Each structure stands twice: as C-alpha cells, then as structure tokens.
C-alpha cells in the first residue's frame, strides 16, 4: 500500500521537530521515521491515515506485527507512537491521543550470566 502525502508530511514534520527541539541523533531519528513509516504503510492497507489512528488501530497493529517480536522492540515502537501522538496533540494535528490506554509489553528480568 502507498502511504498518503498527509501521513508522510506528518512524519517528516515530527522528525524535524524532534531534531530542532531535542537534537536527537541521526540514528534515533532514522529509527523513529522507520517505525512510523511502517505503521503508516500498515494503516494505508486499512484505508486510513496516520492522524486518523484510534487505540483499536494500534492494538491491531501490535497484535498482528509484534506477536513474534521481542518485548523490547515492541516497547520501543510504542514509545515512538506515544511521542508522535503527544506531539500531534500539542500541535493540534489530532484531537486525542490514541496511545493513552496502551500499556508496555512485559519484559523478562535479565539476570547477569556471571558476577565478578
């Protein structure tokens, strides 16, 4: 599916804002752009745009795409979405934040292999 110009514009504006306001590294900005673009592509397959996202859309996306993904990866992507929608709400691009009801995936505690 093809991402709409509106969705691409929203992603570009958000990433630019992060760079200007927070000075995030190029790698971080690239990862944010990739995660949002993958989600926007999935949304295009549902005939929806990024700024039309509902909590149900995000739940479906995570259940379809992250069943076999590590919790750390799913949580990183959730953080990207939370930051995007918090920004979009502040900028008046969306009326509500669909990430408010979503919870992070549970991660197993890591025990060190050896203690020295």
Please report, for each region that a protein language model flagged, where it lies by residue.
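Conserved segment of winged-helix/HTH DNA-binding domains
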Residues: 116
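A detector for short, charged/polar N-terminal pre-domain segments
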Residues: 2-9
